[in-house]
């Protein structure tokens, strides 16, 4: 094989590897952002219910705790809003 063909094949392989790495990072960040939006939405709903009725929904709090993987305790005090 000619050296130019070898260089072209090597460059193509490197480009494919870089593309796979970049798209993997993009996918991981997309999942992280999507998860954070869910958490933000749940926090907003809990705040609205706390303002309206004086207490928050236990079901939403459990769902939020599953998303943040902290058990049943959120890292902030929701009651003092």
From Swiss-Prot:
Question: Phosphoserine is carried by which residues?
Answer: 53, 57
Classification via InterPro entries: Vpu, Vpu_cyt_dom_sf
How would you describe this protein's topology in the membrane?
Single-pass type I membrane protein
Outline which residue ranges sit on the Extracellular face: 1-7
Q: Where is the protein localized?
A: Host membrane
Transmembrane regions listed in the UniProt entry: 8-28
Family annotation (Pfam families): Vpu
Q: Its GO biological process terms?
A: receptor catabolic process; symbiont-mediated suppression of host innate immune response; symbiont-mediated suppression of host type I interferon-mediated signaling pathway; symbiont-mediated-mediated suppression of host tetherin activity; viral release from host cell
Instruction: Describe the family membership recorded for this protein in Swiss-Prot or TrEMBL.
Output: Belongs to the HIV-1 VPU protein family.
Q: What is this protein called?
A: Protein Vpu
Originating organism: Human immunodeficiency virus type 1 group M subtype D (isolate NDK)
